[in-house]
Amino acid sequence: MRSSRSAKVSLVGAGNIGGALAHMLGASQVVKELVLVDVAGGMTEGKVLDVGQALALLGSDVYITGGSDYAAIEHSDAVVVTAGIPRKEGMSREDLLNTNAAVVRNIAENIAKYSPGALVIVVTNPLDAMVWCMYKYSGLPANRVVGMAGVLDSARFSFFLARHMNVSVSSVSAMVLGGHGDLMLPLLRYSTVGGVPVESLIESGRLNRDDIAAIVERTRKGGEEIVKLLKTGSAYCAPAASCAHMLESYVRDKRSIMPCSAYLDGQYGVRDLFVGVPVIIGEKGVEEVVEFPLTAEEQAVFDQSVELIRGSVSAIS
């Protein structure tokens, strides 16, 4: 992979997340070249102009271009996939699965054609099933396909916990496992505030279990809460920042540990599925799955999450 001074990143899907991510990557100058691709070509080109002009004010020379032709993603070092449709009223879970699976399959085939050496970060929902689709249809090695979910869930958990304790969010380190949704599993024994495990803070009386349970539940419903408040959209700044965090670790070979939807081949007792687990992301993509010992209770919740993901994958026709 090229260094950050020459790295090329393509964003497939030029909606709110794609636009916000383009601005973040351009402003931080983590990459040298950005490409936005979307079936809505005119909108994509308009967003390219808007972001490009914003970057000019920031003194960033990151080159940004875009359109509707997948050939533009050729020789990308990384591709972020946000394209897909949200679940609409009256649409069943299976309808959403199969509609977005078809979208992801088309994108996967184009990535295989134009950028088979790229790291692919999938954001499209339902997340864990769509990462599996990308892996299946692109033919890329498992370490080059990953889903963004746990980074976002961890950020939400950290935000809510920091607000509750009235401390800097930089003092909070959170770790979550499992799928992106109601069965997300925060690991309180491995989540810390100022280096002190959350479990220890509960035992010492600084936190109580009811407060933590409420924070966990709000984290699980974090995306839904934002949708209800916005009324006409969904979260995009935090998902974009989560992708930027992953990309920086990859492009700069930082080997940061973060929770992502990654391929499991026996780790945590799971095979042939993409599930949210802690991983090391470096220049080779997902370089290692980090295994934490789980209690019987934690394992039970994790197993439920795995079965939900397995059911989603099985439902794709």
Curated annotation (Swiss-Prot):
UniProt keyword NAD, yes or no: yes
Alphabetical keyword list: NAD, Oxidoreductase, Tricarboxylic acid cycle
Summary of the function given for this chain in its UniProt record: Catalyzes the reversible oxidation of malate to oxaloacetate.
Superkingdom, taxonomy of origin: Bacteria
PANTHER family: L-2-HYDROXYCARBOXYLATE DEHYDROGENASE (NAD(P)(+)), L-LACTATE DEHYDROGENASE
A matching Pfam family: Ldh_1_N
Catalyzed chemical reaction(s): (S)-malate + NAD(+) = oxaloacetate + NADH + H(+)
CDD domains referenced in this protein's UniProt entry, alphabetically: LDH-like_MDH
Gene3D superfamilies the record matches: Lactate dehydrogenase/glycoside hydrolase, family 4, C-terminal, NAD(P)-binding Rossmann-like Domain
EC number(s) recorded for this UniProt protein: 1.1.1.37
GO biological process, one term: tricarboxylic acid cycle
Descriptive protein name: Malate dehydrogenase
Amino acids binding NAD(+): 13-18, 38, 100, 123-125
Protein source organism: Anaplasma marginale (strain St. Maries)
NCBIfam families: MalateDH_bact, PRK06223.1
Residues forming the catalytic site: 180 (proton acceptor)
Positions of substrate binding: 87, 93, 125, 156
Similarity comment: family membership: Belongs to the LDH/MDH superfamily. MDH type 3 family.
GO molecular function: L-lactate dehydrogenase activity; L-malate dehydrogenase (NAD+) activity
